């Protein structure tokens, strides 16, 4: 299991388009990916789960990746989130 903390910098947080982009990116990973915000956990492969967390700009989230090459994918996921645009 690989865990990473990241602060969401995107102006709109993880809503609508950024959330959809994130889900599409994560769906390519064969393992399990979760996002945790303030104790609430969501499956990162589900747009509804991701959006239900209400992640705004400046929110710290924890990413949990389990599966093949989890450390590498966790790092790629942090980079993806840091580069999200509206």
Regions found by a protein language model. Name each.
Residues 1-5, 60-62:
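Intrinsic-disorder/low-complexity, polar/charged segments enriched in Ser/Thr/Lys/Arg/Asp/Glu/Gln
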Residues 7-48, 52-57:
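Compact, glycine-rich, soluble single-domain proteins
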Residues 52-86:
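C-terminal structural segments of small proteins and small subunits
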């Amino acid at each position: 299991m690989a865990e990473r903390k990241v602060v969401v910098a995107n102006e709109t947080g993880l809503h609508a388009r950024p959330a959809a982009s994130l889900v599409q990116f994560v769906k390519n990973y064969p393992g399990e990916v979760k996002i945790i915000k303030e104790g609430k956990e969501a499956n990162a492969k589900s747009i509804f789960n991701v959006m239900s967390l209400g992640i705004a700009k400046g929110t710290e989230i924890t990413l949990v990746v389990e599966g093949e090459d989890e450390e590498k994918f966790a790092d790629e996921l942090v980079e993806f989130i840091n580069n999200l645009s509206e």
